[in-house]
A protein has these predicted regions:
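Long C-terminal extensions of eukaryotic subunits of large macromolecular complexes
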Residues: 1-24, 36, 320-492
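Short coil/turn segments at helix-helix junctions and helix-capping linkers
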Residues: 82-91, 122-136, 168-179, 214-217, ...
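Hydrophobic residues within the alpha-helices of tandem HEAT/HEAT-like
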Residues: 84, 98-106, 123, 138-149, ...
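Flexible helix-coil junctions and inter-repeat linker/turn elements that act as hinges
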Residues: 104-112, 132, 146-158, 171-179, ...
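Long, hydrophobic/aromatic-enriched structural stretches that serve as scaffold segments
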Residues: 129-151, 315-316
Protein backbone atom coordinates (compact mmCIF):
# COMPACT_ATOMS: atom_id res chain seq x y z
CA UNK A 1 0.00 0.00 0.00
CA UNK A 2 1.59 3.31 -1.05
CA UNK A 3 2.41 5.79 1.67
CA UNK A 4 2.78 9.53 1.51
CA UNK A 5 6.32 10.80 0.91
CA UNK A 6 7.77 13.39 3.30
CA UNK A 7 10.75 14.33 1.14
CA UNK A 8 11.05 16.55 -1.92
CA UNK A 9 11.27 14.10 -4.78
CA UNK A 10 8.43 11.87 -6.08
CA UNK A 11 8.71 8.12 -5.78
CA UNK A 12 8.74 6.06 -8.96
CA UNK A 13 5.65 3.97 -9.52
CA UNK A 14 3.63 5.75 -6.86
CA UNK A 15 5.53 4.14 -4.01
CA UNK A 16 6.39 6.06 -0.90
CA UNK A 17 9.73 7.20 0.31
CA UNK A 18 10.78 10.12 2.45
CA UNK A 19 13.87 12.20 2.06
CA UNK A 20 16.77 11.51 4.34
CA UNK A 21 19.37 13.64 5.90
CA UNK A 22 22.85 13.44 7.06
CA UNK A 23 23.49 13.35 10.78
CA UNK A 24 26.56 13.03 12.87
CA UNK A 25 24.67 11.04 15.45
CA UNK A 26 25.64 7.37 15.74
CA UNK A 27 24.55 4.80 18.26
CA UNK A 28 26.88 4.11 21.17
CA UNK A 29 28.50 0.78 20.45
CA UNK A 30 29.82 -0.11 23.89
CA UNK A 31 32.76 -2.29 24.71
CA UNK A 32 30.96 -5.48 23.71
CA UNK A 33 30.44 -4.24 20.17
CA UNK A 34 34.07 -3.18 19.81
CA UNK A 35 35.16 -6.62 20.95
CA UNK A 36 32.76 -8.19 18.46
CA UNK A 37 34.16 -6.14 15.58
CA UNK A 38 37.77 -6.85 16.51
CA UNK A 39 37.08 -10.56 16.91
CA UNK A 40 35.30 -10.66 13.57
CA UNK A 41 38.23 -8.93 11.88
CA UNK A 42 40.70 -11.28 13.50
CA UNK A 43 38.82 -14.32 12.28
CA UNK A 44 38.36 -13.28 8.67
CA UNK A 45 41.39 -15.44 7.91
CA UNK A 46 39.05 -18.42 8.17
CA UNK A 47 37.50 -17.14 4.94
CA UNK A 48 39.26 -15.44 2.01
CA UNK A 49 39.79 -11.75 2.70
CA UNK A 50 37.88 -9.28 0.58
CA UNK A 51 39.90 -6.23 1.63
CA UNK A 52 43.18 -7.37 0.09
CA UNK A 53 41.39 -8.39 -3.09
CA UNK A 54 39.67 -5.03 -3.36
CA UNK A 55 42.97 -3.22 -2.90
CA UNK A 56 44.64 -5.34 -5.59
CA UNK A 57 41.74 -4.70 -7.95
CA UNK A 58 41.97 -0.97 -7.34
CA UNK A 59 45.74 -0.96 -8.01
CA UNK A 60 45.31 -2.96 -11.18
CA UNK A 61 43.42 -0.13 -12.86
CA UNK A 62 42.71 -0.51 -16.53
CA UNK A 63 45.03 -3.52 -16.85
CA UNK A 64 42.44 -5.84 -15.36
CA UNK A 65 39.26 -6.50 -17.22
CA UNK A 66 36.15 -5.25 -15.41
CA UNK A 67 34.24 -8.43 -16.10
CA UNK A 68 37.07 -10.49 -14.66
CA UNK A 69 37.03 -8.38 -11.50
CA UNK A 70 33.31 -8.97 -11.11
CA UNK A 71 33.74 -12.72 -11.56
CA UNK A 72 36.53 -12.85 -8.97
CA UNK A 73 34.41 -10.90 -6.51
CA UNK A 74 31.43 -13.22 -7.01
CA UNK A 75 33.63 -16.29 -6.49
CA UNK A 76 34.78 -14.96 -3.15
CA UNK A 77 31.22 -14.05 -2.20
CA UNK A 78 30.16 -17.64 -2.91
CA UNK A 79 32.81 -18.82 -0.47
CA UNK A 80 31.53 -16.37 2.15
CA UNK A 81 27.98 -17.65 1.70
CA UNK A 82 29.18 -21.25 2.10
CA UNK A 83 31.03 -20.27 5.29
CA UNK A 84 27.75 -19.07 6.84
CA UNK A 85 26.78 -22.69 7.53
CA UNK A 86 30.14 -23.68 9.01
CA UNK A 87 30.15 -25.34 12.44
CA UNK A 88 32.69 -22.87 13.81
CA UNK A 89 31.17 -19.69 15.23
CA UNK A 90 34.33 -17.74 14.45
CA UNK A 91 34.21 -18.82 10.81
CA UNK A 92 30.57 -17.74 10.54
CA UNK A 93 31.37 -14.38 12.12
CA UNK A 94 34.27 -13.88 9.72
CA UNK A 95 32.02 -14.69 6.75
CA UNK A 96 29.34 -12.28 7.99
CA UNK A 97 31.90 -9.50 8.43
CA UNK A 98 33.28 -10.09 4.93
CA UNK A 99 29.78 -10.06 3.48
CA UNK A 100 29.01 -6.84 5.32
CA UNK A 101 32.07 -5.14 3.83
CA UNK A 102 31.30 -6.45 0.33
CA UNK A 103 27.64 -5.40 0.34
CA UNK A 104 28.53 -1.93 1.61
CA UNK A 105 31.22 -1.34 -1.02
CA UNK A 106 29.65 -3.00 -4.10
CA UNK A 107 26.29 -3.20 -5.83
CA UNK A 108 25.37 -6.88 -6.40
CA UNK A 109 21.60 -7.22 -6.94
CA UNK A 110 21.77 -9.98 -9.58
CA UNK A 111 24.13 -12.14 -7.54
CA UNK A 112 21.96 -11.73 -4.44
CA UNK A 113 18.68 -12.44 -6.23
CA UNK A 114 19.98 -15.88 -7.24
CA UNK A 115 20.90 -16.72 -3.63
CA UNK A 116 18.17 -14.91 -1.74
CA UNK A 117 16.67 -18.06 -0.18
CA UNK A 118 20.10 -19.43 0.78
CA UNK A 119 21.03 -16.17 2.48
CA UNK A 120 17.67 -15.96 4.23
CA UNK A 121 18.06 -19.47 5.68
CA UNK A 122 21.64 -18.80 6.80
CA UNK A 123 20.75 -15.48 8.46
CA UNK A 124 17.77 -17.09 10.16
CA UNK A 125 20.03 -19.71 11.75
CA UNK A 126 22.54 -17.05 12.81
CA UNK A 127 19.81 -14.98 14.47
CA UNK A 128 18.20 -18.01 16.13
CA UNK A 129 21.18 -20.01 17.35
CA UNK A 130 24.03 -17.50 17.31
CA UNK A 131 25.30 -15.46 20.24
CA UNK A 132 25.61 -11.69 20.56
CA UNK A 133 28.39 -11.00 18.05
CA UNK A 134 26.97 -13.33 15.42
CA UNK A 135 23.45 -11.95 15.84
CA UNK A 136 24.71 -8.38 15.52
CA UNK A 137 26.58 -9.12 12.29
CA UNK A 138 23.63 -11.08 10.86
CA UNK A 139 21.29 -8.14 11.51
CA UNK A 140 23.76 -5.74 9.85
CA UNK A 141 23.99 -7.99 6.78
CA UNK A 142 20.19 -8.19 6.62
CA UNK A 143 19.91 -4.40 6.52
CA UNK A 144 22.41 -4.26 3.66
CA UNK A 145 20.55 -6.98 1.77
CA UNK A 146 17.38 -4.89 1.95
CA UNK A 147 19.28 -1.92 0.52
CA UNK A 148 20.68 -4.10 -2.29
CA UNK A 149 17.40 -5.83 -3.21
CA UNK A 150 15.20 -2.76 -2.83
CA UNK A 151 11.41 -2.70 -2.47
CA UNK A 152 10.77 -5.52 -4.96
CA UNK A 153 9.14 -8.89 -4.22
CA UNK A 154 12.41 -10.55 -3.17
CA UNK A 155 13.31 -7.78 -0.77
CA UNK A 156 9.84 -7.77 0.74
CA UNK A 157 9.87 -11.56 1.11
CA UNK A 158 13.28 -11.47 2.80
CA UNK A 159 12.20 -8.82 5.29
CA UNK A 160 8.92 -10.55 6.13
CA UNK A 161 10.66 -13.88 6.74
CA UNK A 162 13.18 -12.40 9.20
CA UNK A 163 11.12 -9.61 10.78
CA UNK A 164 9.80 -11.83 13.63
CA UNK A 165 13.36 -12.83 14.55
CA UNK A 166 14.50 -9.20 14.61
CA UNK A 167 11.62 -8.30 16.91
CA UNK A 168 12.32 -11.32 19.11
CA UNK A 169 15.98 -10.42 19.64
CA UNK A 170 15.19 -6.72 20.04
CA UNK A 171 12.63 -7.28 22.79
CA UNK A 172 14.67 -9.96 24.59
CA UNK A 173 16.10 -8.34 27.71
CA UNK A 174 18.64 -11.14 28.12
CA UNK A 175 20.13 -10.74 24.63
CA UNK A 176 23.37 -8.89 23.97
CA UNK A 177 22.96 -5.07 23.82
CA UNK A 178 25.04 -5.02 20.62
CA UNK A 179 22.75 -7.61 19.00
CA UNK A 180 19.64 -5.70 20.06
CA UNK A 181 21.15 -2.46 18.76
CA UNK A 182 21.79 -3.87 15.27
CA UNK A 183 18.39 -5.57 15.21
CA UNK A 184 16.73 -2.20 15.92
CA UNK A 185 18.62 -0.56 13.06
CA UNK A 186 17.89 -3.45 10.68
CA UNK A 187 14.21 -3.44 11.62
CA UNK A 188 13.87 0.27 10.88
CA UNK A 189 15.85 0.21 7.63
CA UNK A 190 14.24 -3.01 6.38
CA UNK A 191 10.75 -1.71 7.07
CA UNK A 192 11.54 1.59 5.36
CA UNK A 193 12.83 -0.12 2.22
CA UNK A 194 10.84 -3.35 1.87
CA UNK A 195 7.56 -3.11 3.83
CA UNK A 196 4.66 -2.08 1.60
CA UNK A 197 1.85 -2.68 4.11
CA UNK A 198 0.87 0.07 6.55
CA UNK A 199 0.23 -2.53 9.25
CA UNK A 200 3.86 -3.66 9.04
CA UNK A 201 4.94 -0.04 9.41
CA UNK A 202 2.71 0.50 12.45
CA UNK A 203 3.88 -2.72 14.12
CA UNK A 204 7.55 -1.77 13.64
CA UNK A 205 6.89 1.72 14.98
CA UNK A 206 5.18 0.27 18.04
CA UNK A 207 8.01 -2.18 18.69
CA UNK A 208 10.72 0.48 18.42
CA UNK A 209 8.71 2.96 20.46
CA UNK A 210 8.37 0.42 23.23
CA UNK A 211 12.16 0.14 23.50
CA UNK A 212 13.02 3.80 24.11
CA UNK A 213 9.74 4.79 25.79
CA UNK A 214 10.66 2.75 28.86
CA UNK A 215 13.42 5.25 29.62
CA UNK A 216 10.91 8.13 29.69
CA UNK A 217 8.83 8.91 32.76
CA UNK A 218 5.09 8.38 32.45
CA UNK A 219 2.74 11.25 33.18
CA UNK A 220 5.49 13.76 33.93
CA UNK A 221 7.29 11.44 36.34
CA UNK A 222 11.06 11.44 36.55
CA UNK A 223 12.73 9.30 33.90
CA UNK A 224 14.22 6.08 35.31
CA UNK A 225 17.98 5.56 35.34
CA UNK A 226 19.21 3.66 32.29
CA UNK A 227 22.37 1.51 32.40
CA UNK A 228 25.24 2.81 30.30
CA UNK A 229 25.31 -0.42 28.31
CA UNK A 230 21.79 0.30 26.99
CA UNK A 231 22.42 3.85 25.77
CA UNK A 232 23.42 2.61 22.32
CA UNK A 233 20.29 0.47 22.08
CA UNK A 234 18.01 3.37 23.02
CA UNK A 235 19.75 5.62 20.51
CA UNK A 236 19.43 3.06 17.69
CA UNK A 237 15.76 2.41 18.47
CA UNK A 238 14.99 6.14 18.54
CA UNK A 239 16.78 6.77 15.25
CA UNK A 240 15.07 3.81 13.55
CA UNK A 241 11.71 5.04 14.88
CA UNK A 242 12.39 8.54 13.53
CA UNK A 243 13.34 7.03 10.17
CA UNK A 244 9.94 5.34 9.89
CA UNK A 245 8.16 8.56 10.86
CA UNK A 246 9.22 10.06 7.53
CA UNK A 247 6.95 7.59 5.67
CA UNK A 248 4.23 7.34 8.31
CA UNK A 249 0.70 8.31 7.13
CA UNK A 250 -0.62 11.61 8.44
CA UNK A 251 -3.45 9.84 10.27
CA UNK A 252 -0.90 8.20 12.56
CA UNK A 253 1.37 11.23 12.89
CA UNK A 254 -1.20 13.20 14.88
CA UNK A 255 -1.52 10.40 17.47
CA UNK A 256 2.25 10.07 17.71
CA UNK A 257 2.61 13.81 18.31
CA UNK A 258 0.12 13.72 21.18
CA UNK A 259 1.75 10.66 22.71
CA UNK A 260 5.48 11.23 22.28
CA UNK A 261 6.14 14.96 22.02
CA UNK A 262 5.62 15.47 25.78
CA UNK A 263 7.85 12.45 26.58
CA UNK A 264 10.86 12.89 24.29
CA UNK A 265 12.26 16.03 26.02
CA UNK A 266 13.08 13.80 29.01
CA UNK A 267 15.78 12.12 26.92
CA UNK A 268 17.55 15.48 26.61
CA UNK A 269 18.87 14.95 30.13
CA UNK A 270 20.46 11.58 29.30
CA UNK A 271 24.09 10.91 30.21
CA UNK A 272 24.81 9.81 26.63
CA UNK A 273 25.67 12.62 24.22
CA UNK A 274 24.54 10.49 21.26
CA UNK A 275 21.17 9.87 22.86
CA UNK A 276 20.74 13.57 23.65
CA UNK A 277 21.55 14.52 20.07
CA UNK A 278 19.24 11.82 18.65
CA UNK A 279 16.42 13.06 20.90
CA UNK A 280 16.97 16.67 19.81
CA UNK A 281 16.94 15.79 16.11
CA UNK A 282 13.82 13.65 16.57
CA UNK A 283 12.03 16.53 18.32
CA UNK A 284 12.90 18.82 15.40
CA UNK A 285 11.60 16.17 12.98
CA UNK A 286 8.32 15.93 14.91
CA UNK A 287 7.86 19.70 14.69
CA UNK A 288 8.58 19.57 10.97
CA UNK A 289 5.98 16.83 10.48
CA UNK A 290 3.51 18.73 12.68
CA UNK A 291 3.96 21.84 10.56
CA UNK A 292 3.28 19.83 7.39
CA UNK A 293 0.19 18.35 9.03
CA UNK A 294 -1.21 21.54 10.56
CA UNK A 295 0.26 25.01 10.11
CA UNK A 296 -1.34 26.25 13.34
CA UNK A 297 0.06 23.41 15.45
CA UNK A 298 0.78 24.62 19.00
CA UNK A 299 2.86 22.82 21.60
CA UNK A 300 1.77 23.82 25.09
CA UNK A 301 5.10 23.34 26.86
CA UNK A 302 7.15 25.28 24.33
CA UNK A 303 8.88 27.54 26.88
CA UNK A 304 10.28 24.62 28.88
CA UNK A 305 11.39 22.83 25.70
CA UNK A 306 13.20 25.88 24.34
CA UNK A 307 14.84 26.36 27.72
CA UNK A 308 16.18 22.80 27.68
CA UNK A 309 17.39 23.17 24.09
CA UNK A 310 19.06 26.48 24.88
CA UNK A 311 20.88 24.91 27.82
CA UNK A 312 22.24 22.10 25.66
CA UNK A 313 23.16 24.51 22.86
CA UNK A 314 25.40 26.44 25.28
CA UNK A 315 26.58 23.51 27.40
CA UNK A 316 30.12 24.00 28.74
CA UNK A 317 30.32 21.41 31.51
CA UNK A 318 33.92 20.31 31.88
CA UNK A 319 33.06 16.76 32.91
CA UNK A 320 31.98 16.10 29.33
CA UNK A 321 34.50 15.53 26.59
CA UNK A 322 35.41 18.58 24.54
CA UNK A 323 34.53 16.88 21.25
CA UNK A 324 31.16 15.78 22.65
CA UNK A 325 30.38 19.30 23.87
CA UNK A 326 31.26 20.78 20.49
CA UNK A 327 29.11 18.28 18.58
CA UNK A 328 26.22 18.69 21.02
CA UNK A 329 26.30 22.49 20.85
CA UNK A 330 26.39 22.46 17.05
CA UNK A 331 23.40 20.12 16.81
CA UNK A 332 21.26 21.86 19.39
CA UNK A 333 21.93 25.31 17.96
CA UNK A 334 20.31 24.06 14.75
CA UNK A 335 17.43 22.40 16.63
CA UNK A 336 16.84 25.46 18.81
CA UNK A 337 16.95 27.80 15.82
CA UNK A 338 14.37 25.65 14.03
CA UNK A 339 12.01 25.21 17.01
CA UNK A 340 12.34 28.83 18.15
CA UNK A 341 11.51 30.18 14.70
CA UNK A 342 8.64 27.74 14.45
CA UNK A 343 7.30 29.09 17.73
CA UNK A 344 7.67 32.67 16.53
CA UNK A 345 5.87 31.84 13.29
CA UNK A 346 3.00 30.14 15.14
CA UNK A 347 2.68 33.08 17.52
CA UNK A 348 2.67 35.59 14.67
CA UNK A 349 0.07 33.59 12.76
CA UNK A 350 -2.18 33.24 15.79
CA UNK A 351 -1.80 36.94 16.59
CA UNK A 352 -2.61 37.99 13.03
CA UNK A 353 -5.64 35.73 12.91
CA UNK A 354 -6.96 37.08 16.22
CA UNK A 355 -6.49 40.73 15.38
CA UNK A 356 -7.94 40.31 11.90
CA UNK A 357 -11.11 39.01 13.51
CA UNK A 358 -11.11 41.86 16.03
CA UNK A 359 -10.46 44.43 13.30
CA UNK A 360 -13.19 43.02 11.12
CA UNK A 361 -15.64 43.03 14.02
CA UNK A 362 -14.78 46.63 14.97
CA UNK A 363 -14.99 47.88 11.40
CA UNK A 364 -18.37 46.28 10.87
CA UNK A 365 -19.73 47.69 14.14
CA UNK A 366 -18.43 51.20 13.41
CA UNK A 367 -19.88 51.25 9.94
CA UNK A 368 -23.14 49.78 11.13
CA UNK A 369 -23.45 52.49 13.78
CA UNK A 370 -22.62 55.16 11.23
CA UNK A 371 -25.21 53.81 8.82
CA UNK A 372 -27.88 53.77 11.49
CA UNK A 373 -27.12 57.36 12.41
CA UNK A 374 -27.26 58.52 8.82
CA UNK A 375 -30.30 56.32 8.11
CA UNK A 376 -28.56 55.07 5.07
CA UNK A 377 -27.29 51.58 4.25
CA UNK A 378 -23.61 51.27 5.00
CA UNK A 379 -21.18 49.33 2.95
CA UNK A 380 -18.73 47.34 4.94
CA UNK A 381 -15.64 46.28 3.08
CA UNK A 382 -13.94 43.07 3.97
CA UNK A 383 -10.33 43.58 5.03
CA UNK A 384 -7.80 42.02 2.76
CA UNK A 385 -6.08 38.92 4.12
CA UNK A 386 -2.85 38.81 2.19
CA UNK A 387 -0.91 35.60 2.70
CA UNK A 388 2.07 35.89 4.97
CA UNK A 389 5.46 35.81 3.32
CA UNK A 390 7.35 35.21 6.54
CA UNK A 391 9.22 31.97 6.55
CA UNK A 392 9.45 29.76 9.61
CA UNK A 393 12.48 27.91 10.87
CA UNK A 394 14.20 25.68 8.37
CA UNK A 395 16.78 22.95 8.74
CA UNK A 396 20.29 24.08 7.90
CA UNK A 397 21.05 22.92 4.37
CA UNK A 398 23.91 20.50 3.90
CA UNK A 399 25.58 19.78 0.58
CA UNK A 400 26.87 16.29 -0.24
CA UNK A 401 29.09 16.02 -3.31
CA UNK A 402 29.77 12.65 -4.94
CA UNK A 403 31.37 12.26 -8.33
CA UNK A 404 29.91 14.91 -10.63
CA UNK A 405 26.66 15.21 -8.69
CA UNK A 406 25.40 17.09 -5.65
CA UNK A 407 22.79 16.12 -3.05
CA UNK A 408 21.13 18.84 -0.98
CA UNK A 409 19.98 17.86 2.51
CA UNK A 410 17.55 20.62 3.40
CA UNK A 411 15.05 19.16 5.87
CA UNK A 412 15.09 17.13 9.07
CA UNK A 413 13.38 14.25 7.25
CA UNK A 414 16.04 14.14 4.55
CA UNK A 415 18.71 14.51 7.21
CA UNK A 416 17.46 11.50 9.19
CA UNK A 417 17.19 9.19 6.20
CA UNK A 418 20.55 10.18 4.76
CA UNK A 419 22.09 9.41 8.16
CA UNK A 420 20.35 6.01 8.29
CA UNK A 421 21.84 4.91 4.97
CA UNK A 422 25.20 6.49 5.79
CA UNK A 423 25.42 4.52 9.04
CA UNK A 424 24.88 1.18 7.31
CA UNK A 425 26.87 1.85 4.11
CA UNK A 426 29.75 3.77 5.63
CA UNK A 427 32.42 4.67 3.08
CA UNK A 428 30.35 3.00 0.34
CA UNK A 429 27.64 5.67 0.56
CA UNK A 430 28.95 7.67 -2.39
CA UNK A 431 29.21 4.55 -4.57
CA UNK A 432 25.59 3.65 -3.82
CA UNK A 433 24.41 7.22 -4.40
CA UNK A 434 25.98 7.01 -7.85
CA UNK A 435 24.78 3.53 -8.83
CA UNK A 436 21.99 2.27 -6.53
CA UNK A 437 18.59 2.99 -8.09
CA UNK A 438 16.88 2.75 -4.70
CA UNK A 439 18.92 5.58 -3.17
CA UNK A 440 18.75 7.69 -6.32
CA UNK A 441 14.98 7.28 -6.33
CA UNK A 442 14.67 8.17 -2.63
CA UNK A 443 16.75 11.34 -2.95
CA UNK A 444 15.38 12.34 -6.35
CA UNK A 445 18.69 12.06 -8.21
CA UNK A 446 17.21 10.63 -11.40
CA UNK A 447 18.60 7.76 -13.50
CA UNK A 448 22.15 6.55 -13.04
CA UNK A 449 24.66 8.65 -14.97
CA UNK A 450 26.61 6.67 -17.57
CA UNK A 451 30.03 8.25 -18.19
CA UNK A 452 32.93 6.72 -20.10
CA UNK A 453 36.57 7.04 -19.11
CA UNK A 454 37.13 9.96 -21.52
CA UNK A 455 34.31 12.00 -20.02
CA UNK A 456 35.49 11.32 -16.49
CA UNK A 457 39.05 12.33 -17.38
CA UNK A 458 37.82 15.55 -18.99
CA UNK A 459 35.87 16.45 -15.87
CA UNK A 460 38.80 15.76 -13.55
CA UNK A 461 40.63 18.90 -12.43
CA UNK A 462 44.37 19.13 -11.95
CA UNK A 463 46.06 19.03 -8.57
CA UNK A 464 46.91 22.75 -8.77
CA UNK A 465 43.30 23.69 -9.60
CA UNK A 466 42.10 21.53 -6.71
CA UNK A 467 44.54 23.33 -4.38
CA UNK A 468 43.22 26.73 -5.49
CA UNK A 469 39.64 25.60 -5.03
CA UNK A 470 40.32 24.24 -1.53
CA UNK A 471 42.11 27.44 -0.54
CA UNK A 472 39.20 29.58 -1.71
CA UNK A 473 36.70 27.32 0.06
CA UNK A 474 38.71 27.50 3.28
CA UNK A 475 38.79 31.29 3.12
CA UNK A 476 35.05 31.58 2.46
CA UNK A 477 34.25 29.06 5.20
CA UNK A 478 36.40 30.95 7.71
CA UNK A 479 34.65 34.23 6.93
CA UNK A 480 31.20 32.65 7.17
CA UNK A 481 31.97 31.00 10.49
CA UNK A 482 33.39 34.25 11.86
CA UNK A 483 30.13 36.01 11.09
CA UNK A 484 28.14 33.23 12.72
CA UNK A 485 30.32 33.32 15.82
CA UNK A 486 29.76 37.06 16.16
CA UNK A 487 25.99 36.64 16.04
CA UNK A 488 25.75 33.43 18.03
CA UNK A 489 24.84 35.21 21.25
CA UNK A 490 21.97 37.00 19.50
CA UNK A 491 20.62 33.74 18.11
CA UNK A 492 20.72 32.01 21.47
Amino acid sequence: MPRARKGNAPRRGGQRRGGGARSSTQADSGSSEDEAASEARSTTSECPSLLSTAAEEGLGGDAVDEQGQQEDLEEKLKEYVDCLTDKSAKTRQGALESLRLALAAHLLPDFLLERCLTLADALEKCLKKGKGEEQALAAAVLGLLCVQLGPGPKGEELFHSLQPLLVSVLTDGTASPAARLHCASALGLGCYVAAADVQDLVSCLTCLEGVFSRSCGVGGATAPMVPTSLHGLLCAALQAWALLLTICPSTHISHILDRQLPQLPQLLSSESVNLRIAAGETIALLFELARDLEEDFIYEDMEALCGALRTLATDSNKYRAKADRRRQRSTFRSVLHFVDKYRAKADRRRQRSTFRSVLHFVEVRVRLDASLQECAPGTATKPSHSPSTLQGGECEEETVRFGLEVLYVDSWARRRIYAAFKDVLGSGMHHHLQNNELLRDIFGLGPVLVLDATALKACKISRFEKHLYNAASFKARTKARSRVRDKRADIL
